Swiss-Prot record:
Designated name of the protein: ATP synthase gamma chain
Organism per entry: Actinobacillus pleuropneumoniae serotype 5b (strain L20)
Location of this chain's protein in the cell: Cell inner membrane
Keyword Transport tagged: yes
Gene Ontology MF annotations: ATP binding; proton-transporting ATP synthase activity, rotational mechanism
GO BP: proton motive force-driven plasma membrane ATP synthesis
Gene: atpG
């Protein structure tokens, strides 16, 4: 029965692991729902600021803000949003692959890349590659605060303003649904133009803005960029929880399958042991 005892111990170990993965799945599900609510709440604010900026920029014929002006690109900046924790499947790896493909494209054009990193997984990955990292933020937790993110964002904004980079992008995982998270790389600076359909020109926008358009655009553009990166962080967090939920469910299901297989092996071992004992009893009786 030594073999059967070892199998029982292994079954107990797998059951304990299954309890842990099931608990992690349930926690990830709860966190994902809360993050989805936060994500939905912040999106209208960001979209409205974007529309106001576009209308002010269109109405201010005599002033062209540097954040809205295209340049010849010699150096680009990327804000890459990754996770602080693992156990979320291939979420980070898929994002890293997408960014590395972009970096290769820029390198082929003799354009250098500088990074601002959010999330410890991204920090360790890109630093190991020896890439130029301007700023980094880690340990944002499950309730990221704008104040923690602003530093990395402003670092890139100032680099663009001072001509140290000629374009800024943000890379993150967009939450599509529970089963799908898509790596996305979006341009932040110079600010892409909105289509007339997105501007919603049916409404009345004949407003007099105070202070003057230049001061207002300066303030709104910085706030908009901070909001966009915050939105990316929240989106990535929802993707992380969804990916972790799926990964832990798969681990729980696999543990259940392994337990069934081990139980079958245990039953066979026990059956063989009982059969041997019966054979010994019968042989002993025959000898008498």
């Amino acid at each position: 029965m030594a073999g059967a005892k070892e199998i029982r111990t292994k079954i107990a170990s797998v059951k304990n692991t299954q309890k842990i993965t099931k608990a992690m799945e349930m926690v990830a599900t709860s966190k994902m729902r809360k993050t989805q609510e936060r994500m939905a709440a912040s999106r209208p604010y960001s979209e409205t600021i974007r529309k106001v900026i576009s209308h002010i920029a269109k109405g201010s014929i005599g002033y062209k803000h540097p954040f809205l002006t295209e340049r010849d690109i010699k150096k680009v900046g990327y804000l890459v949003v990754s996770t602080d924790r693992g156990l979320c499947g291939g979420l980070n790896i898929n994002l890293f692959k997408a960014t590395l493909n972009e970096f290769k494209t820029w390198k082929d054009k003799d354009v250098s890349v500088e990074l601002g990193l959010v999330g410890s997984k991204g920090v360790s990955f890109y630093q190991n590659l020896g890439l130029n990292v301007r700023s980094q933020v880690t340990g944002l937790g499950d309730n990221p605060e704008m104040e923690r993110i602003v530093g990395a964002v402003n670092e890139m904004i100032n680099a663009f303003r001072n001509g140290e980079v000629d374009a800024v992008y943000v890379a993150y995982n967009r939450f599509e649904n529970t089963m799908s998270q898509k790596p996305v790389i979006a341009q932040l600076l110079p600010l892409p133009k909105l289509d007339d359909d997105e501007l919603d020109t049916k409404g009345s926008w004949d407003y007099i803005y105070e202070p003057n358009p230049q001061v207002l655009l300066d303030s709104l553009l910085v706030r908009y960029l901070e909001t966009q990166v915050y939105q990316a962080v929240v989106d990535n967090l929802a993707s992380e929880q969804a990916a972790r939920m799926v990964a832990m469910k798969a681990a729980t299901d696999n543990a259940g399958t392994l337990i069934d297989e081990l139980q079958l092996v245990y039953n066979k071992a026990r059956q063989a042991s009982i059969t041997n004992e019966l054979n010994e009893i019968v042989a002993g009786a025959a000898a008498i």
